[in-house]
Amino acid sequence: AAYFYGLFMQELEHAEKTNTPVDWNKMSTYRYIDWSITTPIMLLVLCLYMANNINATVKLTTYLSVVVLNYIMLAFGYLGEIGTTDRTTGLVGGFIAFGLMYAIIYNTFMSKYSFANSVLFWFYAVVWSLYGVVYYVGDGYKIAVTNVLDLISKCFVGLGLWAYYTKILAV
């Protein structure tokens, strides 16, 4: 993720130095490449964490279904971003895949009650749904807000899990 943030900064600095407009499509491409790498890992962590809390295992077919839906969600979003399809189609298609992906996770790992699972599941679901809300915001604001969402969904979740498993934080 840090590599892609470096590319964002280079793009912004280049536009400023050359007094040319920022290439938002290029920035979106960087963002979606980053997400294509990081989101499957984040979803694996979510599934492993939730399975561990209910003494279950993560079936490969379940994880692969979640990852395929994740890539479908990203594909719809990206195609809407770069104008291959309209944004509404990108948003609706992305949210359908998002809903199915989270339904699989919910049905698989929320069958037994676990407060910790509920907290993390709903945290992920709400934060990730905010990306869809920000989808219609102007490009400059969207980059800034998605950077904040990335910070929350990547860094803070990682820190929270570390704190939980080291028993510094009990849920």
Regions found by a protein language model. Give the residues of each.
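Polytopic alpha-helical membrane-helix bundles and their juxtamembrane interface segments
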Residues: A1-I33, T39-V171
